[in-house]
């Protein structure tokens, strides 16, 4: 497969329906999300949501939802990948609530889901070819 794991995180404010947001996130990743309630600097409660995907079946389902964005991810791979072979993606939280997957650019504002995809790259392997196998 070439992916070790996927980590995703989002936030929801007290005024939002946290249950609805969590359901949408579970649809998006096919995994359960941890909800950690905390208080923001300004006072209202905020839900810190996170999940980790490691199982092949869940990874395959998640990658299938990203399929319309595979060409964009490959084209922007140099900008989105760090030195630890982690691909950083941002998706619109509002679109996921509507069960659509929209990749966001770094300059776009709004509620988002941060996704980090850790690639399995071993000495002698080319990161570009591994990414092409996954997203190609």
Predicted regions and their residues:
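Mid-chain, well-packed structural core segment of small domains
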Residues: 65-100
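Glycine-rich, aromatic-bearing surface loops/beta-hairpins
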Residues: 91-136
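Helix N-cap motif at beta-to-alpha junctions
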Residues: 14-15, 52-58, 122-124
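A common structural junction motif
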Residues: 28-33, 69-73, 107-112, 135-136
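Short glycine-/aliphatic-rich beta-strand segments at the starts of folded cytosolic domains
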Residues: 6-10, 49, 83-90, 113-118
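Short amphipathic alpha-helices in soluble, non-transmembrane regions
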Residues: 21-26, 62-69, 131-134
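Long, hydrophobic N-terminal alpha-helical segment
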Residues: 1-35
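Short, charge-patterned binding micro-sites
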Residues: 35-58
């Amino acid at each position: 497969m070439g992916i070790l794991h996927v980590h995703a995180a989002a936030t929801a404010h007290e005024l939002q329906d946290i249950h609805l947001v969590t359901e949408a996130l579970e649809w998006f990743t096919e995994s359960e999300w941890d909800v950690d309630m905390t208080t923001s600097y300004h006072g209202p409660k905020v839900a810190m949501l996170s999940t980790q995907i490691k199982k092949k079946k869940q990874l395959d389902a998640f990658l299938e939802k990203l399929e319309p964005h595979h060409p964009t991810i490959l084209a922007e791979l140099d900008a989105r990948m760090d030195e630890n072979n982690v691909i950083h993606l941002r998706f619109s939280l509002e679109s996921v609530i509507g069960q659509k997957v929209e990749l966001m650019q770094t300059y776009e504002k709004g509620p988002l889901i941060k996704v980090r995809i850790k690639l399995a790259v071993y000495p002698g392997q080319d990161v570009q070819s591994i990414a092409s196998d996954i997203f190609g």
